[in-house]
């Protein structure tokens, strides 16, 4: 085996390892979105059971003022989220650790926004409940992304040290700067929360349209939940997986370049993977 074939084989081994790792990340993303969907489904079903009569519930009915009991129920739910977050933060001695379950600063900001802007009617209360579920889910996503990107960066530093025969760049601060770097004017965490905003808008749109028609058992079962299920478990989940793959590729490439630069290398041969696009394939062996 000549030198070029050796390096191709070595890179292919790493590619297969990455594929297996990303399959596990995809499974965890699926779990997060499944939990989010189930909680949202429960909230919508609870809303229907609480307010609908024999004919269902109309938009006018949904916009009636809510009772103090309804407000207390929402407040208790929000309090549970915050208390659990505080407990997790205390258990971690207040340190920032993406493996912990406490809310990120972004998640806390989103929750404050929901609390501040909630109108006192049934529909807005439902939206607030759904908002809590989306905040919790996207907070989990942000932590998963952070862990995955940091691990990929550190692994690549270690791998490049083995290839280049030099000291491992095991610098957590350097890894953090790569993971949280702006890419096309946004950090990975910004993109996670932008996805939450898009989901929120889409769910509110679906619910409002259903209430205009009259939210009844048939509408709920045949129109509302299938749309929401597709939006969450297919569209948004797939988008999250694509985003993570893109970000993993970005941090791995940046870690490679940092390793080359730190060790004085300014030339390299580009090896395109089998599934590369036509533009990247044109650079193979260049």
Language model features with spans:
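Acidic, glycine-rich two-metal-ion catalytic cores of nucleic acid-processing enzymes
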Residues: 231-286
